[in-house]
Amino acid sequence: MTSQDAPAWLAERPEIETIFACICDLNGVMRGKRVPIEQLDKITSGALRMPLSLLSMDIWGEDIEDNELVFDTGDADGLCDFTGRPLSPVDWTSRPAAFAQLWMREEDGRPFMGDPRRALAAVVDRYKALGLTPVVATELEFYIVDPSAAVPQPPCSPVTGKRLDSDGALSLDELQHFDAFLNEVYDACAAQAIPADAAISENGAGQFEINLLHVADPLEAADDAVLFKRLVRGIARKHGFAATFMAKPYGDRAGSGMHVHFSLND
């Protein structure tokens, strides 16, 4: 999507009043600003600013001690460029919104290489220079948990009302019990052009895996993965759950992983 296409996209969706302008940090967490749609041009023209340091925070969103991007520069801003990924609807918030994906550049126009998306783009350029095309897909595992508990515990089934208490790998019952949640995940993936494929229940109670299809663009595959994680968490909250992609939320149950399938075509 170009900056010229974005206003037409919003005009077709008059219910949208807010845009989440976001950048992916080094931990795969989306960070950014809530911006009124009147500032769309600022987002798509590369005029929006955010601190360069936001890309190197820890997983809790705090500055790393002695981070030169904070103290040595006075926490200087960088400029945020529109990546060109189409604006996408966010329907799990209290009001409909849109999502815009950005990446950072320096004041002089150079890509900011502390941005993981910029770093990946540089690697992809090296493959292209060799006449090679990476083809990439991801598989993401996550748990649905009960957010009301002080410590993670499996959720109650929306069908039976009983808490899940056993592991159920490839359980059709577990898929069907969480059918409303999974249906909305797939709808959101379609709306955000994320190529969601098969879903299975995994080895842990309330654990699922959803595969994303192969694409011949590592940047697109990485974008798909981080946006997928965000929408799963958002839709889980809408349904009264919490979702976690944490590697080991339970000490006595199977952990969650992310599998990356990677091929090179010449």
Where are these regions (language model features)?
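ATP/Mg2+-dependent ligation/transfer catalytic cores
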Residues: 1-198, 220
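Short, solvent-exposed loop/turn segments at the edges of secondary structure
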Residues: 95-97, 137, 203-205, 255-259
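A short glycine-rich, hydrophobically flanked beta-strand micro-motif that places a catalytic Asp/Glu
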Residues: 138-141, 198-201, 242-250
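A short, mixed-charge helix-start or loop-turn motif at secondary-structure junctions
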Residues: 167-168, 213-215
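A short mid-domain helix/strand-loop element embedded in enzyme catalytic domains
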Residues: 196-211
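Acidic, glycine-rich loop-and-beta core segments that form the ion-binding/anion-interacting portion
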Residues: 207, 212, 218-266
